[in-house]
Amino acid sequence: MKRGGQPEHYSIRTASVFLGIQIQCAQCHKHPFDRWTKADFDSFTSFFRVSRMATLKGEDARGVRNDYHKVSVYLGPSERFAGKVKSTPPKILGGPLVPYVEGGQDPRIVLWEWMRSPDNPTFARSIVNRIWGHHLGVGIVEPLDDFNQAVPPSNPALLNWLAKDFMAH
């Protein structure tokens, strides 16, 4: 996957890096070892269908390293394909559909707010597992980016305690 890829790439990468969830199998069929379905994949990918890569220019590009001149830009609701393409409403993995976003707000902000919410331990568990794995050579869940029903944490109580402490600070 490369920067500037398709929305599906952003969906797969975001789930893996920030949530420790592998959903790429669900792009075509139900995940063989986990609960994720094609509908879950399509709904999660909808968070990323409203953006494209754009190049920073002028004042915006000053002081930015060359390889970071491309950024993701929110396009806003599109009228171009209204009524022509069936769209899937954004849905948080394992969570509810995201209600209509008021005022043209980027739905990725809604996703980010959910990811870092104290009500959602998934992000915190994934991050503390990565930090643990980086410093100690092995994660509490291995591989680091594959929390699933078939691979339980080696020490669930420790993982939960670290995640709660991470969220508190």
Mark where each language-model region is.
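Primarily short, surface-exposed interaction patches in extracytoplasmic proteins
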Residues: 1-169
